[in-house]
Each structure stands twice: as structure tokens, then as C-alpha cells.
Amino acid sequence: MSEPRKILVTSALPYANGSIHLGHMLEYIQTDMWVRFQKHRGNQCIYVCADDAHGSAIMLRAEKEGITPEQLIANVQAEHSADFAEFLVDFDNFHSTHSDENRELSSQIYLRLKEAGHIATRSITQYFDPEKKMFLADRFIKGTCPKCGTEDQYGDNCEKCGATYAPTDLKNPKSAISGATPVLKDSQHFFFKLPDFQQMLQTWTRSGTLQDAVANKIAEWLDAGLQQWDISRDAPYFGFEIPGEPGKYFYVWLDAPIGYMASFKNLCDRTPELDFDAFWAKDSTAELYHFIGKDIVNFHALFWPAMLEGSGYRKPTGIAVHGYLTVNGQKMSKSRGTFIKARTYLDHLSPEYLRYYYASKLGRGVDDLDLNLEDFVQKVNSDLVGKVVNIASRCAGFIHKGNAGVLVAENAAPELTDAFLAAAPSIADAYEARDFARAMREIMGLADRANAWIADKAPWSLNKQEGKQAEVQAICATGVNLFRQLVIFLKPVLPLLAADAEAFLNVAPLTWNDHATLLSNHQLNEFKPLMTRIDPVKVQAMTDASKEDLVASQTDTGESAPAGNGELAKDPISAEIEFDAFAAVDLRVALIVKAEAVEGADKLLRLTLDLGGEQRNVFSGIKSAYPDPSKLDGRLTMMIANLKPRKMKFGISEGMVMAAGPGGEEIYLLSPDSGAKPGQRIK
């Protein structure tokens, strides 16, 4: 038997400036399931994380609330810890970047980089908020991306195209703090010489450490040439002062990833059998994995490995990147009640419902994951209650009534139990590859076979026949053993269900290797319902409560609707028109037959629209909001049907579809209510 693997795993650090929401939880649940699988298999797998507790945002929020930054991050850490615990995210240590360990390691790594010649110093022209009397951190400047032209982007990187840049490259900058137009002032800054590591990064990023799609994106940045990275910020700033440089602080993205190391060191200092160097030394044979979202790939796949290489530490074994979460096919929305905080979800629903749904959707790629609330209810109720738990509930009563709760030794379906045994390696491979969706499909396929076999044997009918009781006991004992196998396979995803099943089965905590055996002549405990169906009313209550969270947050922050800063304030209602002018516009329901990108056009999609007997070709500037045009296929929308055709570079546009929003990614194509038909007039 091979030696247990030594694995250290991290998730991205949640920022200590707000609540955890379901988009965040996607990553922590994904990581937790993988860690639990490794532990389930007998490997030494350590999962550490921390709150990302530095930066201007925290300093400014604390100032606004009249408390110290230290008090703020302590309050937020308590909230985060409670949310994670109730979602069954089982960290071995959850620390803070505002810690002695992180200060020590950040200073050490910086000084090692400096001694090796990887730190440069020069004066830069930096934005300064004339109203707040402070230099502006990158995330407190907003404007237009200099690379792709997307509006409302932060001063350090573009969430649309992934480009990184200096804040001074941003077009039309505004202070996100005061709204003032910032002025430029000179300041002495410190830079990490990232280009020193170009060759190493080209090799490392193609060594299997990244998914192919991520490696391809990184290659684009590498091919464009790396730039020195500004790692300093000016006072006032909440963070660690750079050694020997009064008034200069480490940029939060320097000490944040070092927080992984600091959290592990904090754990090592309290755990004698753990050796920090065994996991972080240059020659470490332990495995190191970071789970992150695709929005922070550049920091983890470029800056972080270069910092580690330059300071004499080991680099990650792999970086697992996931996509964003959408809800009902769209970005999470506070007004629609789909921007759901972790706490709001927990107030209404079991964490295991969401854990299973995420698992059923998470592949090993970087595609976005959609939480469709109707599908969520149907899938959980069908798979977990209707398939898995149903097996135990079908069989347990007969065993308790007919054999005092004792499983007989006879295996009534050896071919089926052998099939379950044979499926284990494939399921394990799917877990290992982080292809949770495939693992869940294979497990539910087994559950379908078990239910079909029990239905075919119909112990409820046999039990009414004279002399069939022994056969009933054999069938039900086999059914309970099949249920036990499913629980073993699902335990990394559903630890609460597994614990309740272990209590019913009257067994010690199940491990992966237990799948190779069957229970026989074994006493069961009383069967109690293991999981209840999701009530759609509770889902609706959750979304309603999320809308209430929005109202509460507006009240807490002194916001009001819509006079001060709502949509009408941004885009006032146009001048009145006569009814006849409006009546001249012919609005129709249209079916999007096909949506496709237009070669050579950055913003346009070509829409083929069906008006109920007539097709139209329409060009629409909505590509930024719908990067995957195929998702629009088959959708109903609204169009101006009598707009004079317009000749464009790419063809003739025969109308205009209707959408809301300020532009860029925030465009929302309008749709009629269900039941509307293509070609119907909109009145």
C-alpha cells in the first residue's frame, strides 16, 4: 500500500470588509469537498485559510463606523467563521493576514527579494484625492479599461479582459471614495522585478500546474512581456509598514498570499507534529494546491510563484481555477433577491442542499456555474431524497419489523454489489480531478440501479406472501448495503447526511476503503428521516429576505431610493412626448433563433429573430454582457420592428432589440412574460 500523501490546500482569502455570499461559497465548498475526499482516502491533507484584513477599504469603513480597523476585522472574522462552520467548511486553521506570523513572513520575503536584487525603487506619479487628502489605492480609482474600453473598472486590473495596468493608465478616472477627480502627485514607490522571472514562469505555467484554458490566458500576458509590479502604498494605510521605510506600506496583494503561509505557520506553532519547512521549503515533497476564482489568476499564477521562487520557497503544485456564479442565468442581483448572503441562505435552507447542487455542476474547467433555483429544488429533491435516502427508507422498516433490526448475511444481488465496488476507482478519479459533476453523475447512476432493483424485487409485495420473509430480509439487507456504499461515495459532499447515516447503520465514521466490504449479521439503529425535500416556499422566502437585505443595507449606509443615487439620478427621464409619437413605434415579441459573435466587432452580436413567420437580421451591441451568445438561443425578447433598416459595416440591421442597463457588462436584454408568442404586438 502506498504511503499517504502530504497535501496543503488553500482557498482564496475572503476580504474582511463584508459578508460572505453564495458566490464566495462556491469556492470554499469546492475546496472543502476535495479536502474531505483526500482525508476520506487516508491522506494527510491540511486546509488553511485566513481573512484578508489589510487595505484602504478596511481603514475607510472602520473610520465610517467609528471603530478601529482591528475591531472591524475581528467582527468580520467572527461572522465569516460562523458562516463557514455552518456550511460545513472544515478548515484546519482560519487565521488573519493581520497577524504576527504574516508580518514576519512578509518582511522576510521582501528582504530576501531585495537582497537578491529583485526590488526596484523609483518615483511615480500617483493619484491623490484632494478632498480626502490621501493617495488612492488602485481599488479606489474607477474608470475605463485602457485595454478593452470597458467602463467602471478598478485601477489595477480589468474584470472584463483580465488586463493589469498602472492606475495612471486608466481613462476618465474618479475617486471611488469621494467622487472627486483625482490629481497627480509624485511619490517614491517600491517594485518587484517580475520580468526577472519570465523564463521560469513560462516553463512553470506549462508544467501541468494550471488548467489549459488558464495556461493559455497566462501565455498571452507572458508573450506581451511582464512589467515590474508596484508593491508599496503610502500612508495613511492599514497594513504592514515596509521594513526601514517609514510611511510606506506593503500593498495588500503582497502580504495576502503570504497569508497562506502565515496561517499554516500559526497552525504549526500549535501542532508539534507539523513542520512548516516540510511543506514550504524549496525541496519540499509535499503537495501544495491553491483554489481560486478566475478573477485573481494573474496574482496567483504570475506574482505569487515569482515571489516564492525569488525568496527561496517552493512553488505550488497546482492552482485550481473556477468560474463565477450566476443565479437563474444572470449575474447575482440585489434587486432580484439573487444576491444571497451565506447567512440568509442558512436562515432558510440546509447547507447540504447547496453543497450537493454545486458538486453536481462543478467540472474541472473554468466555466461559470449557474445556480438555477428551480433546477436546484428539483435536483436535490430528486437525487438526494428521491434516490439516495429513498433506498434506506424503503428497506429499514422491513428489517426492524421482520428481523429486529439485524441485517442478514445473504447478498441478494452479488452482481449489483460488485458493480458498486467496480465503480469506486472511476468515482475516486473524478473527485481527484475535481470533476465533481462526473462523480455525482456516476453516483446517481448507481442509485438509479439500486432503486430499479428494489422496485423490481418489490419487498413490500413479497412481505405479504407466505414464506417469503427470508427473501424480503435478504433484499432489504442488500438495499441497506447499497445505501451504505452510496453514503461512502457521497461523504466528502454531504458530511451531515453521512454522520446521520452512520448513526442509523450503527458504524464508526466511514472511510473510503469501507466501500470494499458489506455489513452482515449487523444490528441497525432505529431509522429516522435523513433528509427532507426542499420546499419552494422556503426558496422564495430566501430571495425575499435577500431583497430585504438590500433595503437594510441602504438604510445602514444612509442610502435611499431612488432620489440620491438610484438609476433615475444617473439617467433622468427624457422630455415628454405626444402619444402619437409613441404609437408610431411598432414593438413586437421576437424569438432569438440564433445569436452569434460578429468577426471583427468587439461589441456586436448578430441576432437572427423570428417574428412569427418572418425572420430579421439585427446587430446589437450586447456582446460584453453576453460573452456566450449561444445562451440567448431560444429566448424571447422585444424589438422595434418598424425601424428603418440600417446599413452597417457587417451587414444590414433590420430593427433593434430592447435592453436596459448602463452598458458594458451591465446590459439586460428585455423579455416578455411567459406565454407571449413571436410576432405579437407589444401594447
Swiss-Prot record:
GO biological process, one term: methionyl-tRNA aminoacylation
Subcellular location: Cytoplasm
EC id: 6.1.1.10
Main localization (coarse): cytoplasm
Gene Ontology molecular function: any one: ATP binding
Binding-site residues for ATP, renumbered to this chain: 334
Residue positions of motif 'HIGH' region: 14-24
Domain named tRNA-binding: residues: 581-683
Cofactor(s) listed in the protein's UniProt record: Zn(2+)
Short sequence motif named 'KMSKS' region, residue ranges: 331-335
PANTHER family hit by this protein: METHIONINE--TRNA LIGASE, METHIONINE--TRNA LIGASE, CYTOPLASMIC
Sequence similarity: Belongs to the class-I aminoacyl-tRNA synthetase family. MetG type 1 subfamily.
Function according to Swiss-Prot or TrEMBL: Is required not only for elongation of protein synthesis but also for the initiation of all mRNA translation through initiator tRNA(fMet) aminoacylation.
Protein name listed in UniProt: Methionine--tRNA ligase
Organism this protein belongs to: Pseudomonas fluorescens (strain SBW25)
